[in-house]
Amino acid sequence: GTDLPLCAEGRAQLEELKAKFQYPDVPLVFCSPMLRAQQTAEVLFPNAKLTILQDLREMNFGKFENRPITELVKDPEFAQWMDPTSRTNPDGAEDRKAFYDRTNVMLMKLFEYQLRTHTEEAACITHGGVIMNMMANHVLPQHKPEEWMTDPGCGYSLRLDAEMWMRDHIAEAFDIVPYGYLDGAEE
């Protein structure tokens, strides 16, 4: 995907979230190599060790990069590519199955690293498509990928039980990050 920096508006939104709500105090942040993800990590977790992982990058949209979603939803070729039953792969775009496999393997590696090193808390800064895919495939409660969509600067706290992970490759989502973000919000 296109490696754009965090825009001034995005940085201001993150600063506002950090001022209003609580982010967990974690020693380690796994992060996408994309510049905007690294800059997000610097704002939200300035004291954490940053570990850049290539497989946390967003899907490469190829010829659809940098086009507004309002335009893309009207494009029949984009709709066909997004259809889960389609094997269409537009020019320059990452194959959806390759993306699915890459992000699922990455989550497994992250969790196995945490279990092996006894890392009790860590954050992961990545992108919407990566989050939705990982959560839909390895997290309870089960939801469709689009139901795991988060607002910018937000995410989920997961509970990783070693036995459940080793047996089922499943973790449990138990809260929204930042803490307090949904308090008083209508569901």
Q: Which residue stretches match the model-derived regions?
A:
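Generic beta-sheet signal
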Residues: 27, 118-128
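Short, active-site-adjacent cap segments at secondary-structure transitions
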Residues: 36-38, 58-59, 130-132
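Short beta-strand scaffold positions
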Residues: 31-32, 101, 125-126
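Generic structural signal for well-ordered alpha-helical scaffold segments
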Residues: 15-19, 100, 104-115
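Phosphate-handling substructures
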Residues: 4-5, 44-102
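Acidic, low-complexity terminal tails and accessory targeting/binding regions
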Residues: 59-70, 112-120, 135-187
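Active-site-proximal alpha-helix that buttresses catalytic centers in soluble enzyme cores
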Residues: 1-48
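Active-site catalytic microenvironments for nucleophilic, acid-base chemistry
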Residues: 20, 43, 47, 109, ...
